[in-house]
From Swiss-Prot:
It is found in: Periplasmic flagellum; Periplasm. The gene is flaB. Disulfide bonds: none annotated. The flagellum consists of two outer layers around a core that contains several antigenically related polypeptides. This is Flagellar filament 35 kDa core protein.
Length: 283
């Protein structure tokens, strides 16, 4: 029997200390819901999880970017529909005044409406905006030196696409003459020419609207793909990082029992020197 070193107490204390640390770790996992709360819990798992989290955050924002792009196109297409309706009306008036039965006075009255409609085309072009960006003044046309509209549709660098919108002013649509005056229908011949100009303007608008529709559909598919990737990556990160609550509860119960038994054994070990004292008392 020895008294200077109580090895049983030291051993019991060591086991108790490690079990208490394990209980603290398990309780931390249960309180946070995360299996990995620091690099010490699982260094390689944390590294993989952080990479996945980077992609998850990027995918979520890319999805929002794509939806913003869809809103941008919807807004532009709505304004362009108004412009198309106006030019359709100009074309109808041109067909009407191409008929020779109208007097000059009649044509002047129709010209007033045509001029007003041309002015409305310019008003739409000047006031059509999205987040203070002018849509139809050539800012997003091909070859524009002013600016460009980029949609970033992925979680990583350079995963973006450029979108173009042609200039849709009355000048670009050739609804005004070289001197800036609106197209005239003062004679059947001029009115007949206006029909051709209206057709050309409508063709340009229809092509632009078709491009918008195709790009909108593309963005819609992109958004769906991003949502799917976001969901799958989040599931992958969850499997690595999240705690299995049932498993952690079982582990906590086991470790708490070990702590309680370790405490009891430490108390028993601390009583061993008393046996030496009793032996000495018999001398």
């Amino acid at each position: 029997m020895i008294i200077n070193h109580n090895l049983s107490a030291v051993n019991a204390h060591r086991s108790l200390k490690f079990n208490e640390l394990a209980v603290d770790k398990t309780m931390k996992a249960l309180s946070s819901g995360m299996r990995i709360n620091s690099a010490a819990d699982d260094a390689s798992g944390l590294a993989v999880s952080e990479k996945l989290r980077t992609q998850i955050n990027g995918l979520r924002q890319a999805e929002r970017n794509t939806e913003d792009g869809m809103s941008f196109i919807q807004t532009a297409e709505g304004f362009l529909e108004q412009t198309s309706n106006i030019i359709q009306r100009i074309r109808v008036l041109a067909i009407q005044t191409s008929n020779g039965i109208y007097s000059n006075e009649d044509r002047q009255l129709v010209q007033v409406e045509v001029s007003a409609l041309v002015d409305e085309v310019d008003r739409i072009a000047s006031q059509a905006e999205f987040n203070k960006f002018k849509l139809f003044e050539g800012q997003f046309a091909r070859g524009s030196r002013v600016a460009s509209m980029w949609f970033h549709m992925g979680p990583n660098q350079n995963q973006r696409e450029r979108f173009y919108i042609g200039t849709m002013t009355s000048k670009a649509l050739k609804l005004v003459k070289a001197d800036g005056r609106p197209i005239a229908i003062s004679s059947p011949g001029e009115a007949n020419d206006v029909i051709g100009l209206a057709d050309a303007a409508l063709t340009k608008i229809m092509k632009q609207r078709a491009d918008m529709g195709a790009y909108y559909n593309r963005l819609e598919y992109t958004a769906k793909g991003l949502m799917g990737a976001y969901e799958n990556m989040q599931a992958s990160e969850s499997r690595i990082r999240d705690a299995d609550m049932a498993e952690e509860v079982v582990s906590l119960t086991t470790k708490q029992i070990l702590v309680q038994s370790g405490t009891a054994m430490l108390a028993q070990a601390n009583m061993k020197p008393n046996s030496v004292l009793k032996l000495l008392q018999q001398i």
